[in-house]
Every structure is written in structure tokens, then in C-alpha cells.
Regions:
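An active-site-proximal beta-strand-loop segment
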Residues: 35-48
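Mg2+-dependent endonuclease catalytic cores in nucleic-acid-processing enzymes, primarily RNase H-like
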Residues: 3-7, 49-51, 56-162, 208-211
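Short coil/turn segments at secondary-structure boundaries
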Residues: 1-4, 10-16, 99, 146-151, ...
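P-loop NTPase motor core of the ASCE superfamily
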Residues: 155-194
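ATPase catalytic-site recognition across NTP-hydrolyzing enzymes
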Residues: 1-37
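Structured core elements
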Residues: 33-34, 52, 97, 172
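Acidic two-metal-ion nuclease catalytic site recognized across multiple nuclease folds
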Residues: 8-9, 178-211
């Protein structure tokens, strides 16, 4: 079991995360990359962060989500842009989600020119309200991560410390991805229209590797 975080935010609890124990990730029907951007290399600056998520049905009626990758750093703009292209090539997401704010605007425009599947995200609530809005997905044991990976534990530690933690860069990418996927119909709290949506919109990603 994990040692308790020095700071526990108690919006998203550690034991709500599900450990993906298989060395290989599941076959995912849909993959999304979620960015929180900041340009600066100063040590006091915010981090840019990215998380990659896959939707999988695991033989169930309802889809689950798995964290497929995560990275953050203090990058200048050219480095950030290079990272975004590299992450796209690594995971081949169906959608790349970038918050529509000053630091995200240049990246949105530049990446669209390269033909990447960019979607702008405009949050309509404050960070704490956004976190509460996705707790049911965690509480219903729908969110998986490979605990043996250091990057996964970094994301998990940051989500469980929120909003008391020192950093929330990963947390922003988590709430952004989960809200967007839920609102887009890829992940729903009840059965709703998931199967109809899946037939229309979700691609077969057989045989693709993620880690």
C-alpha cells in the first residue's frame, strides 16, 4: 500500500484509483491527450504537463479509462511544441485537448497547421468544482493506472493531494480529459448512450502499443 501523502486533499481518494497490473495496457477504442501549458524555464514557473488516456470496455457494458502516459516539465515554447508533436507520434491519440488560455493559444494554432487533431477546451468552472464533477468516475472504480510506473504515481499523488498540494499541473490535465470525454459521450456515469456513441465514433485500435 502507498504511504499517505503529506497533504491529502480528499476530493479524489487514493483507493478510488484502480491498479492496472497487466504489463500490457488494454486494447483501447479511443485515445486522448490532455495538455496544461505554461511557457517558461524559470525554476519558480508553473510546469507544462500532459497526460494520455485510453477508453476501454474490458468486456463490460460501460467504458473505463486508463492512464497511458504522463510527463511534465518547465519548457520554453519551441521545446513545448516539439514535445507535443513527439507525444502525438508516441501515442497516436484520436484527440489532443489544450486549454484555451494565453499559453495554449500559440500551441493550438501551430499544431493545427501540422494537421494534428486539436480540440480547444474552455473550462466553465473553477478548479475545485471541476475536480468534484469527475469524482463519480473515480468512485465507481472506472479509472485505472499502472501503479508500477513512476509517472503514474506522480499523477496519482498530485490528484489525491489536490487542492492542498504544491502543484496541480497534472490535476488540470486529468479533470480536462475526464470532463471532455464524459461530455463527449465516450465515458458516462450511467449506461446512457455509450453503445450508440461507440458504434458511430470510436475507432478500433487493435494491436497498438502505448507504454
Amino acid at each position: 500500500s502507498q504511504a499517505p501523502s503529506a497533504e491529502e486533499g480528499n476530493i479524489i481518494k487514493l483507493d478510488w484509483w484502480q491498479n492496472w497490473e497487466n504489463p500490457d495496457p488494454p486494447e483501447c477504442e479511443y485515445v486522448i491527450q490532455s495538455w496544461d501549458t505554461a511557457f517558461s524555464t524559470r525554476t519558480t514557473a508553473d510546469y507544462s504537463a500532459v497526460t494520455t488516456w485510453g477508453v476501454f470496455t474490458k468486456g463490460l457494458d460501460m467504458p473505463n479509462l486508463i492512464l497511458l502516459g504522463a510527463e511534465k516539465g518547465r519548457w520554453d515554447y519551441p521545446t513545448l511544441r516539439e514535445k507535443a508533436v513527439k507525444k502525438f507520434k508516441q501515442h497516436e491519440p484520436d484527440s489532443i485537448l489544450i486549454e484555451k488560455k494565453a499559453s495554449g493559444q500559440s500551441l493550438i494554432q501551430d499544431l493545427r497547421l501540422t494537421g494534428l487533431p486539436i480540440f480547444e477546451y474552455q473550462p466553465d468552472k473553477d478548479k475545485v468544482a471541476r475536480a468534484y464533477s469527475i469524482t463519480s468516475l473515480f468512485h465507481n472504480r472506472r479509472i485505472f493506472a499502472p501503479f508500477r510506473k513512476d509517472w503514474a504515481m506522480e499523477v496519482i499523488d498530485e490528484t489525491r493531494a489536490f487542492p492542498a498540494g504544491m502543484h496541480d499541473d497534472y490535476m488540470d490535465t486529468v479533470t480536462q480529459a475526464l470532463i471532455w470525454m464524459r461530455n463527449g459521450g465516450y465515458v458516462v456515469n450511467g449506461a446512457d448512450t455509450w453503445l450508440d456513441k461507440r458504434e458511430q465514433e470510436i475507432y478500433n485500435r487493435e494491436g497498438r502499443s502505448y507504454y
